[in-house]
Structure formats: C-alpha cells, structure tokens
C-alpha cells in the first residue's frame, strides 16, 4: 500500500514513528500531521531527534517502528516516489564550491531527472527567484553563506516538489542573510503552495516564519500548536523561551557553526 487515507489538507502524516540506534531511542513513537501550505517548525535542543526525524521522512534513514506518509506516499512502501515529490536541504552546506551556481543547478536538475528541454529555463527561473542572477556564473566557493543557502533552496525547487524539508536552514548565517532566507521561504510557500517542514533552534525564526510548531524533547513530542497560542496558554506575557522551559525543563541549546560538509553533500546526493 503506497497511499495513506488522508484528507486533502494533510501533506505529512507520522504514525508512531520511531528510530533506535542500539539501546538509544532517538525518535520515540511520534505521531504528528503537517497540513498543506504550512511552514511547520520542529524545535528542540541538540539531540532532541529533529534531524533523525527529517532523515526518516526524506527516506534517508529507515524507521525502527511506525510509518509516515509524505504527499500521500508511504516512506516504507515507495521511498523512490517520496523522493520524487520532495525537496531537501541538509543542515550543512552541500553545494559544490568548485562549480558555479549555474553548474550546481544543472547537476541538481539532472539528479532530479528534470526533463532536458526544461532544464535551462527552470535554472534561469530558480536563479531569478532566489536573487542570484548576477552571481550565477561565479564559483560557489566565493559565495557568502546566505547566497549558498539560497542556491541550495534553488536546487531543491528545480523539480517542483510539493514538500520541502530543511534541516537548520539558517544556522551560522548573519541576521541579514537569515531574513533573506526567510523571505524566500515565504515566497515559495505563497507562489508555489509549497509545504515546508524545517528544524530549528531559533525562537526568532519560529516567531517570524512558522505557522505551527512542534517541540521535541528527548525524541518525544512535548507539545504542538500555533506559536502565539502556545505562549498564551502559559501566560499572557509568555515567550517561546517560556514555552520551551515549561515543556522541556530548560533553556534551548544553540548549535555551533559550519563543520566539514563532505558527508552532508554525500547525503544530499543520495536523494537522487
């Protein structure tokens, strides 16, 4: 069975989704729906299970138990079809610095089997959408971190996915670059009716970008809801930091900067 019984508003459905590594349970029987057209945030400290969950939903990591449906397709029964319907940007920068922006997009277009007669125009459109027209023929090693992130978003949208998965999309970026990425994500949701599921440590990112939020703690779903309503449920003056402390008993940990990207690039290549 490749199709789940979903109503038209649900694009991602997780049912008791679990992943173990030996005796350690990284994601513990998580059940959650994401509706069509949402920008949905997964918030949690390091080790909460956010990246493991994303890797299961993008079929890069099989679940130990449970099931999930993405764009109506089972991640267990038909992972190849899931990959055709989604875009994915890993946490660490995955673009090839020794290629130009345009060459990176051409590589991705081939990887995602974009029809040959459509590749040139889709690349032009994606570069324009991400405001990278003037940098298209420069080597990516000379791009800023924010430009690389926008290039990776362009790569992920080339095959017109219905769902976009982003793992810490603005980690390590300065405030101006972060807001540029947020603007592009809002435009992608508006212009293409795209559903976005992103992981984050950043409370400001959630407040500015996410329609709905799920907080993960030790691999379990602590709470889910609209960010402003979660705050009001704690107190009239509560912030998302207060919500996190209430459900998880501590302050969220911020992750560091970029590390070696080779493994993340190899992970991205396996999406093809």
Report the location of each language-model feature.
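Catalytic Walker B motif of ABC-type/P-loop ATPase nucleotide-binding domains
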Residues: 164-167
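Helical segment within the ABC ATPase nucleotide-binding domain
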Residues: 179-192
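A short, surface-exposed alpha-helical micro-motif characterized by mixed small hydrophobic
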Residues: 206-208
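ABC ATPase "signature
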Residues: 224-225
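Conserved ABC ATPase "signature" region
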Residues: 106, 110, 117-135
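Conserved catalytic motifs of ABC-family nucleotide-binding domains
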Residues: 160
């Amino acid at each position: 069975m490749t199709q789940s019984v979903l109503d038209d508003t649900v694009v991602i459905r997780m049912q008791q989704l679990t992943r173990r590594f030996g005796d350690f349970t990284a994601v513990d029987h998580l059940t959650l729906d994401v509706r069509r057209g949402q920008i949905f945030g997964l918030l949690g400290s390091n080790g909460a299970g956010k990246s493991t969950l994303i890797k299961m939903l993008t079929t890069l990591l099989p679940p130990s138990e449970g099931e999930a449906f993405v764009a109506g397709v089972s991640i267990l029964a038909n992972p190849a079809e899931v990959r055709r319907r989604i875009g994915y940007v890993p946490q660490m920068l995955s673009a090839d610095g020794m290629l130009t922006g345009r060459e990176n997009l051409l590589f991705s277009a081939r990887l995602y089997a974009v029809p040959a007669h459509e590749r040139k125009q889709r690349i032009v459109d994606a570069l324009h959408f991400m405001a990278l027209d003037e940098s298209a023929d420069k080597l990516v090693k000379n791009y800023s971190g924010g430009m690389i992130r926008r290039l990776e978003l362009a790569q992920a949208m080339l095959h017109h996915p219905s769902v976009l998965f982003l793992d810490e999309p603005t980690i390590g970026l300065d405030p101006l670059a972060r807001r540029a990425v947020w603007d592009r994500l809002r435009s992608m949701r508006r212009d293409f009716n795209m559903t976005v599921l992103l992981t984050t440590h950043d409370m400001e990112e959630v407040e500015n970008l996410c329609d709905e939020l799920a907080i993960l703690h030790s691999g379990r779903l602590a709470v889910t809801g609209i960010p402003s309503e979660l705050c009001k449920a704690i107190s009239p003056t509560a912030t998302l930091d207060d919500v996190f402390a209430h459900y998880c008993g501590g302050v969220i940990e911020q992750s560091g900067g970029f590390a070696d990207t080779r493994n993340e690039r190899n992970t991205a290549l396996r999406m093809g």
